[in-house]
């Protein structure tokens, strides 16, 4: 049984006039708000913690991130019990394809949303195991023993080519945009320690603060309330 202490926060930031991020946390969707919860994760329980960062201009990004988080919430709720890792991996692939098609088709049906898409990254529990799903360039970090480690990979042209002159926000994989999408799917169960702190964020944070700066903040305040300090540093950056 795991004791989880969670804090989530969604903030428009200092530049944009709308917030295209959406948080999925244990069946709830959150945008432009903060929320805290402490609970025990009992065996067989389904737990979700994800961030989706929409793109598409106007309100397209907001709509895409909402569609993706709603779709995954339905997926995890309806997922049958007793699936093997291999079968679960196949179900994740099916969900990615279906959700990509859903968002793409909505963009065709509603011209104001044409070309919209979203990243999607986070963790979920299933059958006493913890898994990571990653699509795009939003990030999942683990902080342990004073060291911050990025667990997700950016599906960006910069990371793919190693060319640092390429803008960091040029991505080649997302739900809705492009001809297809894929997900990195990884089991984390054997890598978990009681002391671990996980940070899930969009590029609204990771583009403003380096990994070293995030690590420095967490070293001073290694608890969920670190969000306040991270947000302050982001504003100063």
Where are these regions (language model features)?
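PP2C/PPM-type serine/threonine phosphatase catalytic domain
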Residues: 1-231
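A short, hydrophobic C-terminal helix/tail in secreted or cell-surface proteins
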Residues: 232-237
């Amino acid at each position: 049984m795991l004791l989880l202490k969670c804090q989530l926060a969604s903030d428009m930031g200092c530049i944009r006039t709308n917030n295209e991020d959406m948080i999925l946390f244990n069946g709830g969707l959150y945008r432009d708000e903060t929320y805290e919860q402490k609970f025990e994760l009992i065996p067989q329980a389904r737990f979700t913690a994800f961030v989706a960062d929409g793109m598409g201009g106007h309100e397209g990004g907001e709509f895409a991130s909402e569609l993706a988080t709603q779709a995954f919430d339905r997926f995890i709720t309806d997922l049958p019990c007793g699936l093997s890792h291999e079968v679960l991996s196949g179900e994740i692939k099916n969900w990615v394809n279906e959700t990509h098609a859903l968002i793409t088709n909505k963009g065709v049906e509603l011209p104001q949303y044409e070309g919209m898409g979203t990243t999607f990254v986070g963790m979920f529990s299933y059958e006493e195991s913890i898994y990571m799903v990653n699509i795009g360039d939003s990030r999942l970090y683990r902080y342990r023993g004073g060291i911050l480690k990025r667990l997700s990979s950016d599906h960006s042209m910069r990371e793919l080519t190693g060319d640092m002159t390429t803008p960091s926000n040029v991505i080649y994989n997302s739900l809705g945009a492009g001809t297809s999408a894929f997900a990195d799917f990884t089991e984390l169960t054997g890598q978990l320690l009681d002391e671990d702190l996980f940070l899930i964020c969009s590029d609204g944070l990771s583009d403003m603060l380096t990994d070293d700066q995030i690590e420095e903040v967490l070293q001073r305040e290694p608890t969920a309330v670190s969000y306040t300090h991270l947000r302050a540093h982001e504003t100063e950056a």
